[in-house]
A protein has these predicted regions:
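Canonical P-loop GTPase G-domain recognition
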Residues: 99-159, 312-318, 324-326
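Hydrophobic residues in beta-strands of the RecA-like P-loop NTPase core, especially within AAA+ ATPase
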Residues: 84, 105, 253-254, 320
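Alpha-helical coiled-coil heptad-repeat segments used for dimerization/assembly
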Residues: 72, 128, 135-138, 142, ...
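Conserved Switch II/interswitch segment of TRAFAC-class P-loop GTPases
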Residues: 25-26, 53, 57-60, 87-90, ...
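Conserved G1/Walker A P-loop phosphate-binding module
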Residues: 10-19, 143-283
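Short hydrophobic segments within beta-strands
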Residues: 22-24, 207, 319
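N-terminal accessory targeting/assembly segments
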Residues: 1-113
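Amphipathic alpha-helical transducer elements in NTP-driven molecular machines
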Residues: 28-32, 64-67, 90-93, 105-108, ...
Length: 326
């Protein structure tokens, strides 16, 4: 797996608001959500930089004045990370790292890193690694010599092959290997789902925005005890279990990964084995944290992703959660 963030690095986080049409659909507290994501990655927030941007520049995403502001903060704090609450292109990320002399992450890279720390099952770890490698393959413009060492180094290169070509080939080989293993896991899940249908069991899949409280609700059923925590993406693996309530014995409950706005496409594609459990559900139980002042936006984001995943034809029942805190 790709090297993750070091222990509690100091970071400068950057919020650049875009001038967009339809701002009424924007999150009310996206900055707070992003700060929570940064903390969840193990980062200490040393400073925040705010700004607005009409059209991102091709070389740095932000304008020269903002670049200098961040550079000064990085130097003052000896920051190890600069994290953008935006999507950066590979060239923008590379150029900023040269200017700041430190590592730069965008929103996608941050979420991938959090997933890497949360994955516990074999399948979950493979899915995260596939997403990371897919993301990394678009950013292979620097030397990644650690990839060579992972496979032994000497004898890997073809005649005249550059380090960059070697790394691309190694990543391509690893991606191919992971996909084969995930396909095998996917086929096994298909067998399991067929067995459930044959046994005339109905499946209720819990869906919702990350940290909405799906897993604590799942744990209300005596036989369904899973790890739950008040932090983003505490649950990554899809788990389906029966319950011991007499009147509901034919119903199976499935807990799944939480959604988030601007979920990286690499994760959606890589988590096919997990998300397919939703496609075969008889009912989607949409868990909503109504104590969150931003819950209306998050409901829209979940419904949008449900539509994008092709799940709109499955009946949906909304469950308002955390009403005692509202």
């Amino acid at each position: 797996m790709i090297e993750r963030l070091s222990v509690e690095p100091v970071s400068v986080i950057v919020h650049m608001d875009r001038f967009l049409i339809g701002t009424e659909n924007l999150s009310l507290n996206s900055k707070e959500e992003f700060k929570e994501l940064c903390r969840s990655s193990g980062s200490i927030i040393g400073a925040e930089v705010f700004g607005k941007i009409d059209k991102p520049t091709s070389n740095f995403f932000i304008k020269a004045g903002k670049v200098e502001e961040i550079k000064a903060l990085v130097k003052e704090l000896s920051a190890e990370l600069v994290i953008f609450n935006n999507a950066l292109s590979p060239s923008q990320e590379r150029n900023l790292e040269k200017i700041f002399c430190t590592r730069v992450l965008d929103r996608t890279s941050l979420i991938l890193d959090i997933f890497a720390t949360r994955a516990t099952s074999h399948i979950g770890k493979l899915q995260v690694e596939l997403a990371q490698l897919t993301h990394l393959s678009t950013r292979l413009v620097r030397g990644w010599s650690h990839l060579e060492r992972q496979k032994g180094g000497i004898g890997l290169r073809g005649p005249g092959e550059t380090q960059l070509e070697t790394d691309r080939r190694l990543i391509g080989q690893r991606i191919k290997s992971i996909k084969k293993r995930l396909d095998k896991a996917h086929n096994q899940k298909e067998v399991n789902r067929y067995s459930r249908k044959k046994g005339k069991n109905q499946v209720v899949a819990l869906v919702g925005y990350t940290n909405a409280g799906k897993t604590p609700l799942f744990n209300c059923f005596p036989q369904n005890m899973l790890y739950a925590a008040d932090k983003p993406f505490a649950t990554l693996d899809s788990v389906t279990r029966k319950n011991s309530i007499p009147d509901l014995k034919s119903i199976l409950f499935s807990d799944t990964v939480g959604f988030i706005s601007d979920l990286p496409t690499q994760l959606i594609e890589s988590f096919k084995a997990t998300l397919d459990d939703l496609r075969t559900a008889d009912l989607l139980l949409h868990v909503v944290d109504i104590s969150d002042k931003d819950y209306r936006f998050k409901v829209k984001e979940v419904m949008k992703l449900i539509d994008e995943l092709g799940l709109s034809d499955i009946p949906i029942l909304r469950e308002n959660n955390k009403s005692d805190k509202a």
